[in-house]
Amino acid sequence: MIDTLRPVPFASEMAISKTVAWLNEQLELGNEQLLLMDCRPQELYESSHIESAINVAIPGIMLRRLQKGNLPVRALFTRCEDRDRFTRRCGTDTVVLYDENSSDWNENTGGESVLGLLLKKLKDEGCRAFYLEGGFSKFQAEFALHCETNLDGSCSSSSPPLPVLGLGGLRISSDSSSDIESDLDRDPNSATDSDGSPLSNSQPSFPVEILPFLYLGCAKDSTNLDVLEEFGIKYILNVTPNLPNLFENAGEFKYKQIPISDHWSQNLSQFFPEAISFIDEARGKNCGVLVHCLAGISRSVTVTVAYLMQKLNLSMNDAYDIVKMKKSNISPNFNFMGQLLDFERTLGLSSPCDNRVPAQQLYFTAPSNQNVYQVDSLQST
């Protein structure tokens, strides 16, 4: 069969498509130089996907980093084996990306599609990349034998995509988070706004109140006795491996240290339960608690977001938005964001089949959207 290729309307000079018939033929022939990338939400991927495909997903709030070019494609894979497989084969294999249907692309808006952006980045990195005409739905309808389906899944594969998880046809918003990405400890004064202008002058020089008892700050805040006294802080959660607990021997403060570096290889999520318990202990004793790392924009933010997710029953996006409204220069590293996504699924917050009802009607309204959040039960009394 002759390979069917045609220019993609939104980027004809850089991206071409493959038909589902062509892909079926390659799978029938056992082509071992074919790398399939499923760009749908993870729930849909786990429910059913084309055989041998690997899933690539990204939180909606991280799209700006992808657009700015601060992330290599390999960084989008949350599973190490998928990342390694992509790294080994992307330079030699034919890479085919697919979303659910690839039907909404056109010359005017397709260039803003994340799938289109990913195609461009793959081309820039030297990959032979294509998109699948009609996407997964068309391939499954015509060649279901080459689809792997999880019959034990609790959610239907027809559930609507979750925007926080999938790439697919998501559009890049100018309101996305700032594009700071580093595997090293970062200086909060180096943060920039979406247009590249510094944020340092607008950032507070003291801990930021996230909840009436919960404060987010940097290492400097943890060494300022006047600040600690002003905010009634008696508990200090130090999310670094090497910064000292300065007043530990004085007996006036209770410390907990989480020995994690700001690096993609670190597993911060394993410490979520004890960090959340420590924060709750401070709340129970009507004490303020400071969560800090070095710069106060990555590790400490990740822990704070995890706390809000569990205690307020929030999705990662909503919890992140609350923190960002209070402190605009936050920038957790990409791997920590992936761990928050896993935590979201563990809490059952991302499942379309989750019909849990909050036990208490206690509310907090975030100005960034119309969602209503439980928070009164977390306020110190």
Swiss-Prot record:
Active site: C293
GO MF terms, alphabetically ordered: MAP kinase tyrosine phosphatase activity; MAP kinase tyrosine/serine/threonine phosphatase activity; phosphoprotein phosphatase activity; protein serine/threonine phosphatase activity; protein tyrosine/serine/threonine phosphatase activity; protein tyrosine/threonine phosphatase activity
GO biological process terms held by the UniProt record: cell differentiation; negative regulation of ERK1 and ERK2 cascade; negative regulation of MAPK cascade; positive regulation of apoptotic process; regulation of heart growth; response to growth factor; response to nitrosative stress; response to xenobiotic stimulus
Domain Rhodanese stretches: 30-148
Reaction catalyzed: O-phospho-L-tyrosyl-[protein] + H2O = L-tyrosyl-[protein] + phosphate; O-phospho-L-seryl-[protein] + H2O = L-seryl-[protein] + phosphate; O-phospho-L-threonyl-[protein] + H2O = L-threonyl-[protein] + phosphate
Free-text tissue specificity from the UniProt record: Expressed in lung, heart, brain, and kidney, but not significantly in skeletal muscle or testis.
Segments of skewed composition (Polar residues): 189-203
Post-translational modification (record): Ubiquitinated by the SCF(FBXO31) complex, leading to its proteasomal degradation.
InterPro entries: Dual-sp_phosphatase_cat-dom, MKP, Prot-tyrosine_phosphatase-like, Rhodanese-like_dom, Rhodanese-like_dom_sf, Tyr_Pase_dom, TYR_PHOSPHATASE_DUAL_dom
A GO CC annotation given for this chain: cytoplasm
SUPFAM superfamilies documented for this protein: (Phosphotyrosine protein) phosphatases II (SSF52799), Rhodanese/Cell cycle control phosphatase (SSF52821)
Domain of life (superkingdom): Eukaryota
Domain Tyrosine-protein phosphatase: 206-349
Pfam families in alphabetical order: DSPc, Rhodanese
Location of this chain's protein in the cell: Cytoplasm
Enzyme nomenclature, EC number: 3.1.3.16, 3.1.3.48
Keyword tags: Cytoplasm, Hydrolase, Protein phosphatase, Ubl conjugation
Residue span of region Disordered: 176-203
Quaternary organization: Interacts with MAPK1/ERK2.
Family that this chain belongs to: Belongs to the protein-tyrosine phosphatase family. Non-receptor class dual specificity subfamily.
Function: Dual specificity protein phosphatase, which mediates dephosphorylation and inactivation of MAP kinases. Has a specificity for the ERK family. Implicated in muscle and neuronal differentiation. Plays an important role in alleviating chronic postoperative pain. Necessary for the normal dephosphorylation of the long-lasting phosphorylated forms of spinal MAPK1/3 and MAP kinase p38 induced by peripheral surgery, which drives the resolution of acute postoperative allodynia. Also important for dephosphorylation of MAPK1/3 in local wound tissue, which further contributes to resolution of acute pain.
This protein's name: Dual specificity protein phosphatase 6
Species this protein is from: Rattus norvegicus
Lineage: Eukaryota, Metazoa, Chordata, Craniata, Vertebrata
